Amino acid sequence: MAQESSNMDQSKSDNVTDNKPNRSLISMARPSPQRCHPLDQQSASTSSLPTSRPSSSPGQSPNITPSILTSDTLHLPARSVSPTRPWTPSRGSEWSRHMPLSVSSVNYEPPEINCSPRPGTPSSKYGGSPRRPLRQPVVCWPPASSAGETSIDIADGGDDSEDPFVVGERTVHQRSNTRSSIKLIQFTMQLSPQLLQMKRTPWVKLTLDDGEDDESDFNVHYGPAPTGRQERRGVRKAQMTKKEVRLMNGELVLECKIPRMLHSFLPRRDDREFTHMRYTAVTCDPDDFTVKGFKLRQNIGSTMRETELFVCVTMYNENEIDFTRTMHGIMRNISHFCSRTKSRTWGKDGWQKIVVCIIADGRQKVHPRTLNALAAMGVYQDGIAKNVVNQKPVNAHVYEYTTQVSLDPDLKFKGAEKGIMPCQVIFCMKERNEKKLNSHRWFFNAFGRALNPNICILLDVGTKPEPTALYHLWKAFDQDSNVAGAAGEIKAGKGKGCLGLFNPLVASQNFEYKMSNILDKPLESVFGYITVLPGALSAYRYHALQNDSTGHGPLSMYFKGEMLHGKNADVFTANMYLAEDRILCWELVAKREEQWVLKFVKSAVGETDVPDTVPEFISQRRRWLNGAFFAAVYSLIHFRQIWRTDHTITRKILLHIEFLYQFVSLAFTFFSLANFYLTFYFIAGALSDPTVDPFGHNIGKYIFAILRYTCVLLICLQFVLSMGNRPQGAKKMFLSGMIIYCIIMMYTVFSALYMVVMQLKTSKEMIKDSLSLGNNTFTYIIVSTLSTVGLYFFMSFLYLDPWHMFTSSIQYFALLPSYICRLQIYAFCNTHDVTWGTKGDNVIRTDLGTARITSSSTVELEMPSEQLDIDSGYDESSAISATDSKCPRQSHPRRRCRKTTTAVRTYMVSVWFIANAILAMAVSEAFTEKSVGNNAYLAFVLWSVASLAVFRAVGSTAFAILNVVHRVMEGKMKFAAAGGTGYGYGSYVGSSSGGGGGSSGVRSSGAGSSLGLSSGMGEKVSDWASETGWAVKRTAGKLRFWR
């Protein structure tokens, strides 16, 4: 007995020492193949096994038979824990693997297999999922007959005080492969009877000492290697079961619980919108969404709310990085809305007035990793959607959930601890790919009619709005009731550390975006008509978009383009609706008996990625150029619609001035090919004169002859390439053409600078004449060119945003011939390519399953059997989102065009080419290339470009002055309201605070009036300081080169 007691004490001390090895056995990710070693003859009792870790699901685990003492015990030597590999005994030590003990024949899944809480979150009181029995492992020995049942407790040894994943009394292992460890323990316990019998044989004694090279090895055969796709380790496959579900108004609507892991770290769980995801299978057209009785959460129950801001995010096949960049930017904007506690509209519950609608264009097209990101936020669950409901095909799958977490572009969770507020999300995944215009029809005609919002904001996936962008867009509508649409400032993404500027394409587009936001958009905003509100970041007043009683209006004209695709539409109308947002802008301004205007909001900034390869760049600009050209023609033809509006006389005059400016710009666009050739012909040809030749020996003449014929042949080659090739198929030829255009442009610039230097080096008698304004080279080249480039610099400095002039202007001017020739030729040669739909998308798929009707109000469908299956799907989505893998690109088949559109394309290209050719030949014959100072046409072209630049600069300056005056007047009104009489201040507070308090708008007197005045002054000064701080921050950001 004394010997047994000492053995038991020794066993206890060993087990205390070996707690960390036991913990390592459970948490190791990949256990190495284990070898079965015999047991030592001198084993102690098993009475001192470590106690079990507290279960994560109290009260739900099955009862296990208590431990039975045997004559053998586990004797584990003390060792250190390796974070990367299991422990291996040294050759100089004597070690024996001890007999594992058998357990009950029924084993259960551990509670941590599918519902491990998020690391670092308070979830110690959370109960786990119900557990299922595990199947017996398949081994090479027959089943063992256990004499008794033994329970093996697994303890978490060691000090966990410094472990970042210890929460309360529970240790959470981040991404621990629990399933592999549990299988190892079960396999060892299954072998215990065989090891007990082998223990008595003499050969099972294993001693490892220095002089012994051979070691006895007992290899376990696990069977042949598996073939095919294997399940992810640590994640079980969700099991589906058939259930009967009651229909709501004949339609399938499901309320699904969110995964337990997500539920465990939510700060708010007090409402069903936080704990359940709502799925609706929409079987009707978007125009009939409300007519058929479909409702959203904002229309029913405790979540019935008014929607002030409705955000639309359109998505095609973008990856999870682009999606999270946009979605996380929206979540930050919602946090800014909620931080404006003094606002009469917003506040800490301002998120209840904002709804974000994500529309995926085609279930087969959406990126699977983007779905994983949505699933990680709780918005999407796999296995819920169905293809057919009640014998009706499903057109869209609508998921609704109020998420409280966000994923940043690094795929890291951000929650309330980072200031993230709840966000009402509607995820509409269309069954078929029907293009972006149809997605907007779902947004405006289906969900917009159900919510009836005040302001609608349109975003593209990939656009990252700055934290205050959406607020400034909304504020433009709140301050002016005549504003029907607003455009934000789109800036080109320059990559990490501005490394994208080393790509000439990215740099040139950065310059183009900047100058458009400095010159073009402010000019059009002063007139009240912006030709295009960018779909990447724009906003509309929903009331202004509605049609009149006869069914005609902006939305009817906007969606007319979707009805025309695939029908007998002429080429002009089809190309015009390639830029349908331009048609929408025109219809808003020209709406009958209304006086709507469009506004540019420069403080609303969004960053978007721009094409960085030649094929992608050309394909994008093809649609932009064709749509812009034909939409401009449409607005100029129908300019008389302005007369039927309720605009003031001053506004109508300004709009007609803008129409004249657009007509001149359109004419220069049409003849841009000839004007480029003539400019090169006269400026570069001037160096062919032997008296001016900088190289001597007529080298300048030979260079000009080579470049001249090269330019002509290259233009002809562009037509050949554009008529029968796509940029993706002939990328090298398109790229080589752009390089040759750059060489021609650089020689032209060199020629212009050399002639100016020669003019300045003339004799003293000729200096006065050469530098005077008139018909001379100095006037034509220097004054006109510097007036254009100089205005670019002046306006950039005026807007405190000049860095693009130093980093991107050279690349832009070098690629300017490619903009004029390459892009314009390709666009006009592909006017026949107007198809938007995808052929074959009308096939009804059944890969998701169908909901078969069983009675008049119930259907039978397959769903995840219980909470454990929902959790497993969430675990798999989270694990896949955390890995870095690429989704294979889908091939896009070449669209077939009708013969009629091809014929019209031929006629149009022929007319355009012949008109430019006649102009180039006539002017080149009328004027010689050696007489630049007396060339009237060159003077007309250069001075026209300079005049248009001056006109844009005047309009942009007026826009800046109006903004400054508006801010001064706004600040003066706030100061006057805060420093006026008690009545004036009280009324102002009553309107600004949203009616908070019964004393709003009541005259105060005496000490109460002084107290109210002091308090009001403090609040207004605080608001003014906050607004000034944001303005200073934006201005300082513009002055930084790396912005």
Curated annotation (Swiss-Prot):
* Catalyzed chemical reaction(s): [(1->4)-N-acetyl-beta-D-glucosaminyl](n) + UDP-N-acetyl-alpha-D-glucosamine = [(1->4)-N-acetyl-beta-D-glucosaminyl](n+1) + UDP + H(+)
Its cellular-component GO annotations read: cell septum; plasma membrane
User: Molecular function (GO) terms listed?
Assistant: chitin synthase activity
Known EC number(s)? 2.4.1.16
Q: Which superkingdom, per the lineage?
A: Eukaryota
Q: Which UniProt keywords apply?
A: Cell membrane, Cell wall biogenesis/degradation, Glycosyltransferase, Membrane, Transferase, Transmembrane, Transmembrane helix
InterPro entries named in the record: Chitin_synth, Chitin_synth_fun, Chitin_synth_N, Glyco_trans_2-like, Nucleotide-diphossugar_trans
Q: Where in the cell is it found?
A: Cell membrane
Tell me the protein family, please. Answer: Belongs to the chitin synthase family. Class II subfamily.
Q: What is this protein called?
A: Chitin synthase 2
Gene name linked to the record: CHS2
